[in-house]
Amino acid sequence: MDISVKQMYNIEENGHAMGFLKKFMMENAGAAAARLLDERLEGAPRVLAFAGMGNNGGDALVAARHLAGRGADVTVVLLGNPDGIRTEEARWNWSILEKMPSIKLVSGGSFDASVSPDAIIDGILGTGITGEIREPYLSAIKFINGIQCTKMAIDAPSGLDPQTGEAADPCVKVDFTVTFHRMKEGIPKRKDLTGDVTVQKIGIPPEAEKGVL
């Protein structure tokens, strides 16, 4: 059953109210994303994770931590300043990475466009896209689309509206997308952008859907 973005929001709120906190959802989402990417890579890959300032970015931060634990050489690009991270869950995960010298952290929105990773994680916008794509997101999306490597989007490719399937210009194009709990209505409409799509459960109790679906 495909669901709307609003329904997903309400399910998450219900789960949080039950005691399955959003930080647990973020941990499980990021861990699932890391596992799926790791299965597609070999050796000790170089992974470049782009993180926006919301919970989609938080998922990418968790994935980066798990991939470092699996032996990957990880660089995280936070597309803004750390004090601008919008959610408690994402801030908490950034604070963990600050204590991990095994991960290279870049913040402020700038990044080295000469890098050549084996894989890229798109955790820029997710389900939170509104309006025109602006800097520094614009440059990050163009960079992702211009480089040859394995690319994974978390929740939805940045620039794709997971509710309607409408895409901004530019919009990230990836090899595969991992979305969570249930498929969002707009995602299957743009397989040209999403690549293979996998739905991963992240531990949200089925009771959280009561009154929503």
Swiss-Prot record:
Its EC number is 5.1.99.6. It catalyses: (6R)-NADHX = (6S)-NADHX; (6R)-NADPHX = (6S)-NADPHX. Its cofactor is K(+). Keywords: Isomerase, Metal-binding, NAD, NADP, Nucleotide-binding, Potassium. Gene3D superfamilies: YjeF N-terminal domain. Residues 8-210 form the YjeF N-terminal domain. The keyword Glycoprotein does not apply. K(+) binds at residues 56, 122, 158. It is an enzyme of class 5 (isomerase). The keyword Nucleotide-binding applies. Signal peptide: none annotated. Binds 1 potassium ion per subunit. It comes from the Archaea. (6S)-NADPHX binds at residues 55-59, 126-132, 137, 155. GO terms for molecular function: metal ion binding; NAD(P)HX epimerase activity; nucleotide binding. HAMAP family: NADHX_epimerase. Catalyzes the epimerization of the S- and R-forms of NAD(P)HX, a damaged form of NAD(P)H that is a result of enzymatic or heat-dependent hydration. This is a prerequisite for the S-specific NAD(P)H-hydrate dehydratase to allow the repair of both epimers of NAD(P)HX. Belongs to the NnrE/AIBP family. This is NAD(P)H-hydrate epimerase. It comes from Cenarchaeum symbiosum (strain A).
